[in-house]
């Protein structure tokens, strides 16, 4: 199953990292905060302005992005947790 975001929404897959303390203890997922980085896997057509014109999104599929801890809505598609959020919830694109 695929999901196609509407308007100025994007679908983001969180980038997971193994969480360890400095002494090497692995922190379980239930105790760790969710990462605030992800990769965009789908984008909507753009934001509709007051004049009725559609402004394309600045982000594109494959971009690595930073977002706030409470950004977006979590959905589960084909057993995978994804985030649906508006482009304005994205704080920046990681380049390089």
UniProtKB/Swiss-Prot annotation:
<dbReference type="GO" id="GO:0044183">
    <property type="term" value="F:protein folding chaperone"/>
</dbReference>
<dbReference type="InterPro" id="IPR018369">
    <property type="entry name" value="Chaprnonin_Cpn10_CS"/>
</dbReference>
<dbReference type="GO" id="GO:0005737">
    <property type="term" value="C:cytoplasm"/>
</dbReference>
<dbReference type="GO" id="GO:0051087">
    <property type="term" value="F:protein-folding chaperone binding"/>
</dbReference>
<dbReference type="GO" id="GO:0046872">
    <property type="term" value="F:metal ion binding"/>
</dbReference>
<keyword id="KW-0963">Cytoplasm</keyword>
<dbReference type="Pfam" id="PF00166">
    <property type="entry name" value="Cpn10"/>
</dbReference>
<dbReference type="InterPro" id="IPR011032">
    <property type="entry name" value="GroES-like_sf"/>
</dbReference>
<dbReference type="GO" id="GO:0051082">
    <property type="term" value="F:unfolded protein binding"/>
</dbReference>
<comment type="function">
    <text>Together with the chaperonin GroEL, plays an essential role in assisting protein folding. The GroEL-GroES system forms a nano-cage that allows encapsulation of the non-native substrate proteins and provides a physical environment optimized to promote and accelerate protein folding. GroES binds to the apical surface of the GroEL ring, thereby capping the opening of the GroEL channel.</text>
</comment>
<dbReference type="GO" id="GO:0051085">
    <property type="term" value="P:chaperone cofactor-dependent protein refolding"/>
</dbReference>
<protein>
    <recommendedName>
        <fullName>Co-chaperonin GroES</fullName>
    </recommendedName>
</protein>
<comment type="subunit">
    <text>Heptamer of 7 subunits arranged in a ring. Interacts with the chaperonin GroEL.</text>
</comment>
<dbReference type="GO" id="GO:0005524">
    <property type="term" value="F:ATP binding"/>
</dbReference>
<dbReference type="InterPro" id="IPR037124">
    <property type="entry name" value="Chaperonin_GroES_sf"/>
</dbReference>
<comment type="similarity">
    <text>Belongs to the GroES chaperonin family.</text>
</comment>
<dbReference type="InterPro" id="IPR020818">
    <property type="entry name" value="Chaperonin_GroES"/>
</dbReference>
<keyword id="KW-0143">Chaperone</keyword>
């Amino acid at each position: 199953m695929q999901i196609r975001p509407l308007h100025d929404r994007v679908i983001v897959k969180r980038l997971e990292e193994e969480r360890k303390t400095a002494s090497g203890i692995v922190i379980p997922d239930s105790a760790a905060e969710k990462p605030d980085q992800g990769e965009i896997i789908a984008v909507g057509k753009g934001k509709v302005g007051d004049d009725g014109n559609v402004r394309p999104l600045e982000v594109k599929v494959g971009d690595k992005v930073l977002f706030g801890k409470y950004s977006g809505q979590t959905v589960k598609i084909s057993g995978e947790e994804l985030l649906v959020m508006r482009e304005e919830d994205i704080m920046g694109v990681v380049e390089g």
